[in-house]
Regions:
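Terminal amphipathic alpha-helical/low-complexity segments used for targeting or macromolecular assembly
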Residues: 1-61, 65-67, 132, 138, ...
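Flexible, glycine/small-residue-enriched loop-and-beta-strand segment within the central core
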Residues: 61-181, 198, 209-210, 216-218
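C-terminal/domain-terminus segments
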Residues: 182-207
Length: 226
């Protein structure tokens, strides 16, 4: 079975044929919506189950690369000149994407989302998620607040800022990552943690609200060691 899967992944034509066949019934039932309204969408070689893609603007680009598996996902794009790129071999379940006003979302290859994750990019800023990241359920990643916070003289103080997540980061359940946060590679973020506007280096265990480093020089493995 592993050899068959590897053959399919390595053969782009076979991947596209299989994904097209897989996706036909869901296109007919309109589980995949509004793709025709996005001329710059590419999702050949992907496997989509109950996926809704909604475009409310112009010049938006959505790329879902080969061997990606999306299930129960919603992608909403508002305004113009937005970019969403999901690289090869991602498995995303229950993902809700909001991208607006010339913003960008980059999800690198082999990212795994267990369920119910919300990613929102706004005000022309970007969110970047590195390779081989693992998200437990109910993760929230936002680079803006979607409303303005003002001083009494009318000065805004909560502009959106980029969020960057390095390769091979593991998020526990109910983690929230807010604007301006940068997380290095090989980090672990504990359940119910809130990270806001700080920069974290590589190989850290981060827990709490606000997120604090409780251990350094660590990494993680999806396999359970004995």
């Amino acid at each position: 079975m592993k050899k068959i899967k590897q053959f399919v992944r390595d053969n782009e034509v076979v991947m596209q044929i299989l994904s097209f066949i897989f996706n036909i019934p869901f296109m007919v039932k309109r589980y995949i919506k509004n793709i025709r309204r996005i001329p710059n969408i590419r999702c050949l070689g992907t496997f989509l189950w109950k996926v809704s893609i909604n475009n409310f603007g112009k010049n938006n680009i959505i790329v879902i690369e080969k061997a990606c598996r999306l299930r129960n996902c919603i992608i909403n794009v508002y305004g113009d000149n937005n970019t969403i790129i999901i690289e090869n071999d991602c498995e995303l379940k229950g993902l809700n994407i909001w991208c607006s006003d010339g913003s960008k979302i980059f999800i690198k290859r082999n990212v795994h989302i267990v369920d119910s994750t919300h990613i929102a990019s706004t005000e022309g800023k970007q969110i970047e998620i590195g390779e081989r990241c693992l998200f437990a359920s109910n993760t929230v990643i936002r680079n803006g607040d979607s409303q303005s916070i003002l001083t009494l003289d009318g000065t805004r103080i909560n502009y959106a800022r980029d969020v960057v997540i390095g390769n091979h980061v593991w998020f526990g359940q109910n983690v929230t990552v807010l604007k301006g946060t940068q997380i290095g590679k090989d980090c672990i973020v504990g359940a119910n943690s809130v990270l806001s506007g700080k920069c974290y280096s590589d190989n850290l265990l981060i827990v709490g609200n606000p997120g604090k480093v409780v251990k350094e020089n660590v990494t993680w493995d999806p396999r359970v060691s004995r």
